Amino acid sequence: MKKEAKICLNAMVGNEEHCIERMLKSCYEYIDYWVIQCNGNDKTQSIIEDFFKDKDIPGFTYNHEWDYPGINRDHTLQTALNAEHGCDWILRMDADEQLEVDDDFDWSPINDTNFECFNITARSAGSIYYRTWFWNAKLAWYFEHDRRHETVHLRGGAQHNAFNLAPGFRHVITNDGVTWEDPNKFLVDAVELEKTQVAGGKLLEDPYHFWYIGKSYYDAVNLGDYPLGMTHTKEYARRSIFYFENYLDRVHNYKNIEEPFVNEMIYMSLYCIGEMYRKSKEFEKAISFFVEAEDWCPRRNESIVGLAECYNELGDYETMKMQTERLVDPQRTIPFPELYFLVNTNFYIDSGGYGKYLHSIACKNS
């Protein structure tokens, strides 16, 4: 089935002249209207207007000063919702993304305008997950005015039901937009989240952002340039562990759960704690958390990679090989879309080569 419903592209862009046309070229064949907020000072706005003029697709740009992500995303979403575009759906995209649609993609879910919204597959370097960036244009959506990790909702407190679109319709994220120019982006995210959630008294009522404080410090350990070097890294790892452990206890009452069950949030929390201990060279603790994590999501490989990396650093190649043999098992394929929370594509035999790389090290040295 081919596309029948009409789609409005919605975006918010800064100084993106280096990548904006790539995004537009990827999606123009699938859209019927566009509403794009511009808050930069380079040629991005004129590139957008010239591009769509050439393609004869109606829409408009508008200027709005930059405040912070939640406010600006909500402003551009409200502008799209209130525009006279006649579209059924609003598709959100960032400037450093591309839309990929397989030739055999089944458009029937999108043609059914009874759905409230869709979860779209998002792929970045080494990661795949779902995000709710495709909304029914007839409903009253809004972005919460979050400073980081903005969340989208229906007005009136109604819970929305998202349909998982097949991976044949996906966003590909290249992380080369203007927001990625700051090497300490994730540290800034963590501090901003602490300011609003901890100092603002919201932490215990908002488990989503509670988790992302820990994740932002985790990412700050993996990507950042700090004046105190490893001293800073260990401190941010400590903070990540602190938030993940308290998230598990406060949100999941983790210490009182008698039997594990499949839960990706618990799995990723334990895995990230293990990674922070590994980065801090506390291998015994790291191994313990990686083993514990696997109980909560046996199909996922991230914790197995963590174990292999620990044994590699310890020089225990025989034990490392026991783990890497699992990573190259042809049965341990990527579990997406059945499991979909920040799945690392590098760690599965059918989607990446890191497991084979670790296995070659183990075989060579054992």
Where are each of the predicted segments found?
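Catalytic-site signature of metal-activated, phosphate-bearing donor transferases
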Residues: 70-77, 84, 97-235, 239-242, ...
